[in-house]
């Protein structure tokens, strides 16, 4: 099986880059810059990722870059540098790197000035294309032995270079990000240049993970953290296929679930999997520990720690349990700063990862931690899981606690459950649910004055969020648009939702819609 080695210098997009390579049915692994070179020297190609550091301030080029270039000199093994990776390659080949003067973030337009194997049948000379930039440093002059493929139109920055003879390529932009035009096609060309076999599939991943789980667990018992979401459901189905009745499924009602969630999910999972599921109501425990807590990181860590404590308690009741299964996926790990490359910057802690206590009495089984959400759904289809589960919108482990900005109270939970239920039901009514990546309501810590029935009100503000995405790493505001059957337009839909919430949910007198993309915002508010 062909392998592409990605050297991770700390980019938030590194795991997404790996996803894009696997999407091309090519196996890839991610390594830190201090990896022993013997572990990666048999790769078919190397990709140097982006990263938050500045090449301009580096004392010396990392040893791994020297080793890769030396190997390339002997064998012409293809090398691709992205953003920071481009700057490392350029600096190695005697180009100056300058800081700040030509920084670009977000959408940028390129002018293609040269043909190349990596742009073959994708971009023609003279074409202008939109890409996604995220850099403060720039390559000042053309590296020795290289030619420029493209410049940034606005800043006239070197955006793409090549040394065709040695099969070394560099991109200042991020081809792996959804918003880069033809980014996947560029990566596909790089894979072709490397001569990689396209034989890695979700079916092969399924087979391999079953072997991994069996080897890790042996004949020991596993307790499964079931939430009813896509991730935990697929993880449970995969683990159950691997070890059968050694798996014990537990559904924790933490009091932070959506309206009637516990009842709906338990019925759905039992019908789908025919596995016994124990429902444990610990809502009072979670709510008591969250009392007076307003900081989102504290909330996440408290919920994560309590989550583990409860599961350890349930494991003790079963007896002989040594493993805890969780539905952790790649974006959870990335945003917690716990990706394979440890140089990335933490965005937020996730209850499955950043909130775990340092010392645990249960070992973790995380069969999905290498997959993105869309891959998880593909794996679910391989496992025969119904669309009713697979197409559910993502729901965070900390639940409504991070959709209530500020202190979590029973009053706010009830308000949010009711408002969110109205919003989602109207989305489903107009057949929008399956084309929206994620939609939810948020209770803000802001009260505003209103008038209802000739009386003054002073109620909470509810924010609505709906986004489009393919992987959860970048996201845009869902525009609603015009439904061809109902002719419902953006404003009319939001007005219907707003009226329904204000008229039916006590305590809310104002509704707003969040139009912010990711980045700069995250999808969740906390």
UniProtKB/Swiss-Prot annotation:
- Ranges for domain Glutamine amidotransferase type-1 come to 3-199
Q: Does the keyword ATP-binding apply?
A: yes
InterPro entries from the entry? Class_I_gatase-like, GATASE, GMP_synth_C, GMP_synth_GATase, GMP_synthase, GMPS_ATP_PPase_dom, NAD/GMP_synthase, Rossmann-like_a/b/a_fold
Pinpoint the GMPS ATP-PPase domain residues.
Answer: 200-392
Q: Does the keyword ATP-binding apply?
A: yes
User: Which EC class is this protein assigned?
Assistant: ligase
Name the Enzyme Commission number(s) assigned to this protein. 6.3.5.2
| Function per UniProt | Catalyzes the synthesis of GMP from XMP.
Highest taxon of source: Bacteria
What PROSITE patterns has UniProt attached to this entry?
A: GATASE_TYPE_1, GMPS_ATP_PPASE
Q: What name goes with this protein?
A: GMP synthase [glutamine-hydrolyzing]
Q: Which CDD domains match?
A: GATase1_GMP_Synthase (cd01742), GMP_synthase_C (cd01997)
The reaction(s) this protein catalyses: XMP + L-glutamine + ATP + H2O = GMP + L-glutamate + AMP + diphosphate + 2 H(+)
Q: Which HAMAP family match?
A: GMP_synthase (MF_00344)
Q: Give the UniProt keywords, A-Z.
A: ATP-binding, Glutamine amidotransferase, GMP biosynthesis, Ligase, Nucleotide-binding, Purine biosynthesis
